[in-house]
Amino acid sequence: MASSKNMPSRITQKSMEPPLRETWQQVVQEMVMRKQRDEEEKQNLVTGLQASSGDPIYTGNSSDRSTRGPGGKTKRRKGWFQWLRKLRAREKNIPSQFYPDMEGNCAGLENLTLGEGMEENPIYDSTAATNTANMDGRNWMEWR
C-alpha cells in the first residue's frame, strides 16, 4: 500500500472556501436571476400556438435536424411523415369545446335528459338526497 503522505490531501482547507454568508448570497442571486429569465421566456412564447417551450413545431427558426428551413435536410421528407407532423401540430390547437371539463357548459351541448319515468325510478335517486340510515357504517361492516 502506498503511504498517504505521497497523495495530496483531498480535504478543503477552511481558508479556501468563502464565508457562508457570501455563498448563500450567490445562491439566492442565482435563483432570482433564473426565475426572472424563466418568466421572460414564458412571456416570449406565442401563447395560442406553442403550448410549451419544449415543443418545437411552432418555433419560427428551424434547427439543423429539421426537414425544411435554412439548415435542413436537402430532400424534404414527403408523404406520410409530413402528414403526421401536420396532424401532431393540429392536435395542439384542439378548440376548448372538445374539452367540456375545462370550460363551462357551452351552447352546443345539450343537457343530458333521462327517458320518461326514469326520474321517479328509485334506482336513479341520488344517494345524497336519501336518508343516511341505509348508509350506516356499522351495518355495512356486519353485512360484510
UniProtKB/Swiss-Prot annotation:
UniProt subcellular location: Host nucleus, Host nucleolus; Host cytoplasm
Record's keyword annotation contains Transport: yes
GO molecular function: RNA binding
GO biological processes: mRNA transport
Principal subcellular localization: host cell
Compositionally biased intervals (Basic and acidic residues): 32-43
Residue interval(s) of motif Nuclear export signal: 106-115
Stretch list, region Disordered: 1-77
Coiled-coil ranges from the UniProt annotation: none
Segment forming the signal sequence: none
Motif Nuclear localization signal and RNA-binding (RRE), residue range(s) on this chain: 75-92
Single GO cellular component term: host cell nucleolus
Regions of compositional bias (Polar residues) in chain numbering: 1-15, 44-64
Keyword annotations of the record: Host cytoplasm, Host nucleus, mRNA transport, RNA-binding, Transport
Subunit composition and interactions: Homomultimer; when bound to the RRE. Multimeric assembly is essential for activity.
Domain free text: The RNA-binding motif binds to the RRE present in incompletely spliced viral pre-mRNAs. This region also contains the NLS which mediates nuclear localization. These overlapping functions prevent Rev bound to RRE from undesirable return to the nucleus. When Rev binds the RRE, the NLS becomes masked while the NES remains accessible.
Described function: Escorts unspliced or incompletely spliced viral pre-mRNAs (late transcripts) out of the nucleus of infected cells. These pre-mRNAs carry a recognition sequence called Rev responsive element (RRE) located in the env gene, that is not present in fully spliced viral mRNAs (early transcripts). This function is essential since most viral proteins are translated from unspliced or partially spliced pre-mRNAs which cannot exit the nucleus by the pathway used by fully processed cellular mRNAs.
Protein name: Protein Rev
